[in-house]
Design a protein with these regions (language model features):
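Extracellular adhesion/carbohydrate-binding repeat motifs centered on closely spaced tryptophans
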Residues: 1-235
């Protein structure tokens, strides 16, 4: 007796799954912790599908059902929230990571909101995550990476200027900042003052090449000897 073929099968660019005794799978399949959906003809489905009055998204490359959290539509970059069982949230309001999020009838987000995904914070505006560069939100400035994740608790250079953001991702501005034991002065627009003399409230400070201030040392500048105290003020 021939043992019937079981497992994945691709024919004419269509994918099927043959279960026990070689029977072709239709409907939902749970395999290795992932859900897949097959049409009545047995073809694995991908993309959006309306099943039992709910919208589901099945990954284009694998057919795996999206579930448990935020996912972006790969084509439109629109953000959707999927329940643990796979359906997309729609026509409802949920509290997610402390934010009340209203979902429209088709699943898009009404208005704007912060969202937490894969260990990072994102901001959704007009259905998609804003990306690439500085954005002002509720009066504070945040820097978004290319994928939309905000930078948090770090220093970085952008357009030849040094910036710092706190644990919440907010840009430090208009202040002295102690960062890893060095002091930096951040201008009103956030960029650190660069190399040279800085005058603040009738006091002079000298800023090093790395944008940190000199502290408690003697140094030469333009063939002259200068001294600064423990607070960086020129004596």
């Amino acid at each position: 007796d021939e043992t019937p073929y079981t497992g994945w099968l691709t024919l004419d660019h269509k994918t099927y799954y043959l279960g026990e005794n070689g029977v072709m799978t239709v409907g939902w399949l749970l395999l290795d912790g992932n859900y897949y959906y097959f049409s009545d003809s047995g073809e694995m489905q991908t993309g959006w599908h309306f099943i039992s009055n709910n919208w589901y998204y099945l990954a284009k490359d694998t057919g795996i059902m999206y579930s448990s959290g935020w996912h972006a539509d790969p084509e439109t970059q629109t953000m959707y929230y999927f329940y643990s069982w796979g359906g997309a949230a729609r026509n409802t309001t949920l509290t997610l990571n402390g934010y009340r999020v209203k979902f429209l009838s088709w699943g898009g987000i009404s208005g704007s909101t912060w969202l937490y995904r894969d260990g990072s914070w994102y901001y959704v505006k007009k259905y998609s995550c804003i990306t690439d560069g500085w954005h002002q939100i509720d009066g504070a400035w945040y820097f978004m990476n290319a994928d939309g994740a905000i930078r948090q608790n770090e220093s970085f250079t952008y357009d030849n200027n040094l910036y710092f953001v706190n644990n919440s991702g907010k840009m430090y501005q208009n202040q002295w900042l102690n960062w890893d034991g060095k002091y930096y002065y951040l201008r009103s627009w956030g960029g650190a003052v660069q190399e040279g003399w800085l005058k603040l409230q009738n006091k002079y400070y000298y800023i090093n090449e790395d944008c940190s201030r000199k502290t408690q040392e003697a140094f030469q500048y333009d063939h002259n000897l200068y001294f600064v105290d423990e607070n960086g003020v020129m004596i």
